[in-house]
Amino acid sequence: MPRVPSQTPPAPPARWLAGRLAVVTGASRGIGAATAVAVAAAGAHVVLAARDGQALDGVAGRIKDAGGQATPLATDVSDEAAVERLFAEAGGMGRLSALVCAAAVLTPAPFAETTPAMWRETLEVNLTGAFLCCRAAFTAMVRAGEGRMVNIASLSGVYATEKFPGLAAYNVSKYGVIGLTEAIAVEGKEHGISAVCLSPGAVDTEMLRRANPALRPGLTPDDVAALIVALLDSPLAPASGANIPLFSNA
């Protein structure tokens, strides 16, 4: 009787993130923190950025305790010079491959009571911050010849979805993030740079609980982080420029 050779199952394909350098903003808590942990678990060296340095150190400590690589860098993403320092330091650690922009603020106020200062802070962190980080990452990725970005917007920025009252500045900032992602996709194509946007509904974060304690979110930060990692680990080019709404049924 002929001997049947044993068959070894094929090894799973290597994860795209494994061994790469990624920057995650808003990484001190919420979606950003969960994403930093998940990206590190996928094998990337993660540079964590947020204003709260103490909280960043805590998240970085969790990653290192689990055997991952993490570098916390306290950064105000609305400050151009601070963002330039962030990406200069990251560039000294290796070739930047991935960026996740999750930094955001949410200050609810009736439209008529929204002050120019409240408006400016929301737009500067949520939209200008994303622009500054994406621009710095884009420059590094052009040199590398490839790169992947995921920007976090919101259903608040998606056309024709129901909006909550008191979020005029937040809504506008998230519409802008979606448009920014589309622009990056257009100009990044020739350089091998892809960008997609995620627009979650209600996610169970500290920021949302402060803004609307009565809301019962249907998504967790870990849910969103898992999708971000799945996107980064997949070829993004066919979907570059897309906005993916996540309905949480809150």
Segment roles from a protein language model:
Residues 134, 170-173, 181:
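Active-site helix of classical SDR
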